[in-house]
Amino acid sequence: MINIVKKDFMASIIVFLVALPLAIGISIACGLPIYSGIVSGIIGGIVVGLFSGNSLQVPGPAAGLILIIVEIIHTMGVEKLFLIIFLVGLLQILFGLMSFGKWFRAISPAIIQGMLAGIGISIFLSQFHIMLDSKPNNDFLLNIKDLLSIIYNSVLPLDGSPHHLACMTGIITIACIIGWKFLPCKKLHAIPSALVGIIVASLLANFMHFNISYIQVGQNFWSNINFISPQDLSNLFNSSVIINALVITFIASAETLLTSTAIDKMSENSKTDYDKEIIAQGIGNSLSGFLGGLPITGVIVRSAAN
């Protein structure tokens, strides 16, 4: 019993150290306060974890939905985003009660992986700009067009800008993440490589006295709670709200169930109840949307660390 508690405690620490920067990073990438990412991570870990159909899955905000969230905020506003996430939760609960989980399993993994890969390329291009200390465009094609110029500015910062310092930090971080897996000491592999990259980048930035823009938390973190009002609920059956909710429901549910399948293959002790898992995700998303959080899905990065 003591050994089980020790293992679970260590796993929870590792998952926390992976999940927290991930939640904060996704919030920032979406242009939302860090509260949104943290509260969705809390709900995913506690609420969804209590009702989950897979004991090893660690739900939380997912990078695969960043572009959709940014587009919704740009076209419909933040208030509609939270209403959409609330509706996503209700739809997932409905689909779970109607035993739709098995139908999501019928979707070819190649389709979902291809869709997520396409989203991943767009995210990579926008975050590549940020890594080189350049502001990304909202347009995917413009990010491609500006790629060579920002690389040139990073290698030869003729205007005296610190692009090369950001570039150096990014390259060292990526090298740490990739190189960590090749260390001869296997015990060190228990520490996630992404966490090592974050620690190294933070130490480097502080040691070199870089001019860092810190995240502004504010004196009262919980003052950022943005409850859905009765006036917001009046837009629940708006066609744009419903369409966007269906899109997020499909992507989030498919990604969650694919992650569950992957976990089942990774562990002999895991067998997912797919309908129960969708209902759990629905409870989490409806609560997250109500409190101003991000959409919650099962993500392999956090779950693999568990």
Please annotate each region the language model reported.
Residues M1-N306:
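Transmembrane helical cores of multi-pass ion-transport proteins
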